[in-house]
Swiss-Prot record:
Pfam families: IspA. The chain crosses the membrane at residues 3-23, 24-44, 49-69, 72-92, 121-141, 149-169. Belongs to the YciB family. Its main location: membrane. It comes from the Bacteria. GO terms for cellular component: plasma membrane. InterPro entries: YciB (IPR006008). The keyword Transport does not apply. Keywords: Cell inner membrane, Cell membrane, Membrane, Transmembrane, Transmembrane helix. Plays a role in cell envelope biogenesis, maintenance of cell envelope integrity and membrane homeostasis. It comes from Burkholderia cenocepacia (strain ATCC BAA-245 / DSM 16553 / LMG 16656 / NCTC 13227 / J2315 / CF5610) (Burkholderia cepacia (strain J2315)). It is found in: Cell inner membrane. It is a multi-pass membrane protein. This is Inner membrane-spanning protein YciB.
Length: 176
């Protein structure tokens, strides 16, 4: 259910784009992300850092898109967000000795420290590659194809990555 909740602004962006175009879709994404943060704050009293970062990036890049009437800003937004996640994972691990993937998933999984480090690095690399893929699509395909990639391509890549990661992790999980 959380996965669908996380996709909420992207799905609304997609629908608004198909009906009204990129600029209305951008405004819808900003409002949807604000609503998402407000709901999480109301419901749980604590908003994850990743959601705050997502809100900041959509407000800045979405706002620039609307103010300057230039869709390139919203098209760059996923790349900036993915690269910030990648940098955050790597900086936390190597500058502050904190493994953010372990912090997020450590209550659900018991893994050796080197495995957590590999998992953290895998997620950082995955986000870096997604950022590059987004730029490739932005510069080589139509706006409509980019919107389809943003919803279906990145979501599909995420699902495949999680499945492959889960298969890899099974050899480290103890029978309980």
């Amino acid at each position: 259910m959380k996965f669908l909740f996380d996709l909420f602004p992207i799905i609304l962006f997609f629908v608004a784009f198909k009906v009204w175009g990129i600029f209305t879709a951008t405004a819808v994404a900003i409002v949807a992300t604000l609503a998402q943060v407000a709901w999480v704050a109301f419901r749980h009293r604590k908003v994850d850092t990743m959601l705050w970062v997502s809100l900041g990036v959509i407000v800045v890049f979405g706002g620039a898109t609307l103010v300057l009437h230039d869709e390139k800003f919203i098209q760059w937004k996923p790349t900036v967000l993915y690269w910030l996640f990648a940098i955050g994972l790597l900086a936390a691990r190597y500058a502050f000795s904190k493994n953010l993937i372990e912090k997020m998933m450590g209550k659900q999984l018991t893994l050796p420290s080197p495995v957590w480090d590999k998992l953290n690095l895998a997620w950082a690399l995955f986000f870096a590659v997604l950022g590059v893929a987004n730029l490739y699509v932005v510069h080589n395909f139509t706006e409509s194809q980019w919107v389809n990639f943003k919803l279906f391509g990145t979501t599909g890549a995420m699902v495949v990555f999680i499945i492959l990661q889960s298969l890899w992790l099974t050899k480290y999980l103890k029978d309980e």
